[in-house]
Swiss-Prot record:
Record keyword Transmembrane present: yes
Function of the protein: Major component of the type IV pilus (T4P) that plays a role in cell adhesion and motility. Not produced when grown under standard laboratory conditions.
Protein name (Swiss-Prot/TrEMBL): Prepilin peptidase-dependent protein D
N-methylphenylalanine found at: 7
Family of the protein in this entry: Belongs to the N-Me-Phe pilin family.
GO biological process: type IV pilus-dependent motility
Organism of origin: Escherichia coli (strain K12)
Keyword presence, 4Fe-4S: no
Membrane-related topology note: Single-pass membrane protein
Amino acid sequence: MDKQRGFTLIELMVVIGIIAILSAIGIPAYQNYLRKAALTDMLQTFVPYRTAVELCALEHGGLDTCDGGSNGIPSPTTTRYVSAMSVAKGVVSLTGQESLNGLSVVMTPGWDNANGVTGWTRNCNIQSDSALQQACEDVFRFDDAN
């Protein structure tokens, strides 16, 4: 008598169930990882402007003339995750796209005539996605940011 070889239907269903459970756990974690990577790209876009604004403010005695494309501040740029950017009086505004769609980040420098730039205040705004807002606040965290 020949023996049949192979898996039973129940064994296959158990394996499919295990794969489904692992996928349900793994996919959201991977999506959060991708969002943090996108936020890091947005941060990398901001950092040169931060330095340029600080130098402009020190050289010109304030933030009033620190606009994008003038006084040593580069013209605003876009990247894969940044759809729009502006620099006006030292305030750097970034708008997200793709996995950061709907996110806006506003970085505002603090100025003191005696001490110069005293720090940066971040403002991460997105409607109905508190996880992305928290991730934004974590990534755009400086020792002196509020």
